[in-house]
Amino acid sequence: IVSGSPPASGGVALIDALNILEGYDLNAVDKVTRTHLIVEAMRRVHRDRAVYLGDPDFVQVPVARLIDPDYAAGQRASIRMDRATPSDMLPGVDAPSPGPSTTHFSVIDAKGNMVAATITLNFFFGSGLMIPDTGILLNNQMDDFSAKPGVPNGFQLIGGDANAIAAKKRPLSSSTPTFVMAPKGTMILGTPGGSYIIGMVLQGTINFMDG
């Protein structure tokens, strides 16, 4: 699996979630349990997104640790099969809102060249400002920074000091353009959806691998 690296948060979150879920046989459990396990994995990766991820030019992002199977095993050990984890044990994972203004396209040609591209203005019409005589709208990606640690942004995502605003710094993103290469074939995927992106790509990847 090949996916995006910070400041896009999706690749790290996707691999972390897949590592957590690798310890379960999702095809052997009922639909309710399957959904419960996926949700609990996503809650943990969004907690880590809030705490650790930011622009690697400005903060030390522990990518190797976050995608380590041993780290995922520790996350998995905290999941109860019979109940949801109390929210106060997972700060920074409030329910997200979907995003309206993102586009994703996946392309592969006859020679096997692949492109997975996620493009966004962030909110409807971005900042609402247009470059004169061009029709090009300016985005409002500044909202993807943590204006104040612990305070949600426009998509209700909680951030921390790692994603604080700084000059020349890039904001964190949920974009998750991904290539999945397996013996059964290759899948290119990504999606719009704001803070839902990581979870949707995770489910698409699981369905492809299990289907």
Predicted segments with their positions:
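Active-site rim segments in enzyme catalytic domains, especially the processed small/beta chain
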Residues: M114-P183, I198, Q203
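Alpha-helical support elements that line or immediately flank enzyme active sites
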Residues: N19-E22, T191-G211
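Short Gly/Pro-enriched turn/cap motifs at secondary-structure boundaries
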Residues: S5-A8, D94-P98, N163-L172
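Catalytic-loop motifs flanking and including active-site residues across diverse enzymes
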Residues: S9-D16, T103, P171, S175, ...
